[in-house]
Each structure stands twice: as C-alpha cells, then as structure tokens.
Curated annotation (Swiss-Prot):
Belongs to the NAGSA dehydrogenase family. Type 1 subfamily. Its EC number is 1.2.1.38. PANTHER family: N-ACETYL-GAMMA-GLUTAMYL-PHOSPHATE REDUCTASE, CHLOROPLASTIC-RELATED, N-ACETYL-GAMMA-GLUTAMYL-PHOSPHATE REDUCTASE, CHLOROPLASTIC-RELATED-RELATED. GO terms for cellular component: cytoplasm. It catalyses: N-acetyl-L-glutamate 5-semialdehyde + phosphate + NADP(+) = N-acetyl-L-glutamyl 5-phosphate + NADPH + H(+). This is N-acetyl-gamma-glutamyl-phosphate reductase. It is an enzyme of class 1 (oxidoreductase).
Length: 333
C-alpha cells in the first residue's frame, strides 16, 4: 500500500482526491493537510465536506513540518495555490516522494512565463525542466517514469483533448488559429467566498480575455497558437468548450473521424457523443466527452468534462495509476 498525503485537502479538489484515495485498493490515506494559517486546520474532513461523512473522518492538519510529513508518505498530491506548490514540490521531491501537482507551478517549461501569468519568479528551474505534463491520454510514457507530474489544467485538458488528434494528423490549417470558447462552473474559482462566486452575483460572463494563463499553457503543449476565451457559468461544476478550426485543404469528414478514433481507441476515459456533448453527462465522472460537426473547410469540436475531476483530481489519480502500472480506471469509476 502506498502511503498517500494530500496537501490542500480542505478544497473541492482535495476532497475529491481524498475520496479516490479511500476507494483505491493500492493506496492508504496517511495525512490531510492545509496551510499553517488555515481556518480549517483541526477540523475533520467530514465537517468540511459532508459527502465524506462515514467514510473519511480524518482531521485536516496544519502543515508545519514538511520533512516530517514527507518521511511518512510515498505519494503527495498538491491541491494547493500555484506559489505554494512551487515551494513545496521540491521539498517533497528531495525526500523521495512521488509528487502530483494540481497547480500550474510546473506546467510550462519557461521561467519567463511565471512572472507574467502567475505573478512570481520561478526558483526551481531544475524541476521545471524535469516535470512531466500530466495530460494523461497523451503523455502516458513520460508519466510512467517521472517523479514529478504537473497535472494539466481544466480548460487545457478540455481544449487539448479536442484539438490534438486533428493537429497530430496534420488535418488543421494552423494559419487560422483555433478559437476556443469555454464555460466553467463556479467551483473552478475555488471554495473561498468572493464577490465573483457569490450566489447573487454569478452570471454567465467572459473573463481573462486575451490574458488568461491557460492560453499559453494550451498553445505551448499544442505547439500552435490559439485564441482562448473563458467564461464563468452560473452552475456549480463542469466545463463545456466549443472549438472552431479550419481544416487543411481536402480534409474529409472520414479523415476527421479516423483521427479521433485512432487517438482514443484505447483510451477508456474519452468518449464520443452521438450528438454534441453536454455537461450533465460528464459531471461527477472522470470522462471527457467529444463531438464534432464539419461544414466545408471548418470544424466545430465540442468537449465536456467535470472541471473538478477530469480537469483536476481524477486526472491526477489517472496519472498515478499510469505511473504505478495500475489499471487506469482504478478508483475512478
């Protein structure tokens, strides 16, 4: 049994991870932690998240001594803020822990990226270079061998799973950048109360226009520029991404279908919709649903995921399963 610790356990993704660790036959939950100054320190996880009552009654502890915690675990999930993961990941790695980081602190291998999009200067270039990007369906071989997995972001997961099969097969005319319009549930903003996620204030609206940090993450890992506009939806969870692309000259609908089939024929967590995907079919699941329509030289691909699961926690667990050679669906379905 792999002793598994979750840092940032009080948040939505932390609670989802705790449930998956509880279900996993090869993992045992060794600790739940939050920052030293968190108001949640000392409370049980069941107090914070009623859905785990009767399953996980372990207290959420303040993280005050990283070395001691590291000595008592094999695996660490970091469901923490970007700058916190930036500081913690190298400490756990130095103690020989396997790290799965759900923040953006190690996703893009460019130090110049971080001051612009995350507001801090990256101090760990050696781990930035070694970290493997945790887009499970596309990076499995690298995930198997790396001690540091930077789990892909929520919007980037929904977007890349929709675009990569066509891009890899050369079916897209990239002189016309793919246009991604995506809507996320309010849980993507986290659990902390703000005006943005207040019940009476939430409305369908765009944000981060031309400057959202996920745009360069998507573009970097696709290898082509994109136009990305995120929207806040007035619902709890899920992401729906609608992506418009120009097909290369002469590309047929059959070639499109074959590209998707080839990319995901042995990937159990990507499903093809009979029509076009909808959030209600993927919320509370680890799946990504894809559907598309072709008209002339243009294609619209629609992608739906649960932002807290395939966009965060379940993809992290999927990466763990891949890394250790467990069945990919273990603890996920």
């Amino acid at each position: 049994m792999l002793k598994t610790t979750i840092i940032g356990a009080s948040g939505y993704t932390g609670a989802e991870l705790a449930l998956m660790v509880h279900k996993h036959p090869q993992l045992t939950l060794s600790g739940l932690y939050v920052s030293a100054n968190s108001v949640d320190a000392g409370k049980s996880l069941a107090q914070l998240h009623g859905r785990v009552a009767g399953l996980i009654d372990m207290p959420v502890q303040a993280l005050t001594d990283v070395d001691t915690v590291a000595a008592e675990c094999d695996v660490v999930f970091l469901a923490t803020a970007h700058e916190v993961s930036h500081d913690l990941a190298p400490q756990f790695l130095a103690q020989g822990c396997q790290v799965f980081d759900l923040s953006g602190a190690f996703r893009v291998q460019s130090e110049a990226f971080y001051p612009t999009f995350y507001g801090f200067a990256h101090q760990h270039s050696e781990w930035l270079e070694k970290a493997v990007y945790g887009l499970a369906e596309w990076n499995a071989e690298a995930i198997k061998t790396s001690p540091m997995i930077a789990v892909a972001g929520c919007y980037p997961t929904a977007s890349q799973l929709a675009i990569k099969p066509l891009l890899v097969d050369g079916l897209i005319d990239t002189t016309q950048w793919p246009v991604i319009n995506a809507v996320s549930g309010v849980s993507g903003a986290g659990r902390k109360a703000t005006m943005t996620n207040s019940f009476c204030e939430v409305s369908l609206q765009p944000y981060g226009v031309f400057n959202h940090r996920h745009q360069p993450e998507i573009a970097t890992h696709l290898g082509c520029e994109v136009i990305f506009t995120p929207h806040l939806g007035n619902f709890k969870r899920g992401i729906l991404a609608t992506i418009t692309m120009k097909l290369a000259d002469g590309v047929t609908e059959q070639q499109v279908a074959e590209a998707f089939s080839k990319a995901y024929q042995d990937k159990p967590l990507v499903r093809f919709s009979n029509g076009l995907p909808r959030i209600q079919d993927v919320e509370f699941t680890p799946f990504c649903d894809l559907g598309w329509k072709v008209q002339g030289r243009h294609i619209i691909v629609v992608s739906a995921i649960d932002n807290l699961l395939k966009g965060a926690s379940s993809q992290a667990m999927q990466c763990l399963n891949i890394h250790y050679g467990f069945d990919e669906l273990t603890a996920l379905v």
